Amino acid sequence: MKHIAGKRIWITGASGGLGERIAYLCAAEGAHVLLSARREDRLIEIKRKITEEWSGQCEIFPLDVGRLEDIARVRDQIGSIDVLINNAGFGIFETVLDSTLDDMKAMFDVNVFGLIACTKAVLPQMLEQKKGHIINIASQAGKIATPKSSLYSATKHAVLGYSNALRMELSGTGIYVTTVNPGPIQTDFFSIADKGGDYAKNVGRWMLDPDDVAAQITAAIFTKKREINLPRLMNAGTKLYQLFPALVEKLAGRALMKK
């Protein structure tokens, strides 16, 4: 992965979980990592580790991507960017009846509008240099919705639709667009999404290792890879859903209602 050595890679949601792992892998390969998240204390810790273990170049830019007015300010502070990894996001698993409009707005602000705003912020420079890569972390939930994930699935459907259209718009510009569609990953995501722990327990055997997911994402940088779909068996399920939606909804609905 020496192809990313010296490249400036902006990672949102970098204070833990998948974003943190991606930052370490990129730094280990000599990339100049630019980290954003709300938790400045965690960003400081991650920067210290990168500096000590890999003598890596790392800068931190605290940011809540749900606050769209702050994105342009941080973008100006960062300077040039070769790769944007839109990783920031969260979910709340509730029924449609029990979910709130505040939850809906918060999820769309971060998962969708924040992602779009960060992308728009880097595009002019990438177009000028005729090279770049935008990697959007979506989800298998963006391909197949399940009970209690209506709002979260809606945000990830939006990310996939946006990314697919953007990829076509940027054809021939030298800018790649990749979406990452993982199933459940063993991270802090479920401390918010699934406070009772029932869903994590129910899908435990399908849980992905964040280090493995991060490795696949990092390896895809500056390739024309359209999508990364994980795990393979769950991705096969989404393809089956496209062919037999009623059957899959009946079977999956029963199993996944335990969120």
UniProtKB/Swiss-Prot annotation:
This is Uncharacterized oxidoreductase YqjQ. Its EC number is 1.-.-.-. CDD domains: 11beta-HSD1_like_SDR_c. The keyword Membrane does not apply. It comes from the Bacteria. One of its GO terms (molecular function) is oxidoreductase activity. Substrate binds at residue 139. The active site is at 152 (proton acceptor). NADP(+) binds at residues 11-35. Belongs to the short-chain dehydrogenases/reductases (SDR) family. SUPFAM superfamilies: NAD(P)-binding Rossmann-fold domains. It is an enzyme of class 1 (oxidoreductase). Pfam families: adh_short (PF00106). GO terms for cellular component: membrane. InterPro entries: NAD(P)-bd_dom_sf, Sc_DH/Rdtase_CS, SDR_fam.
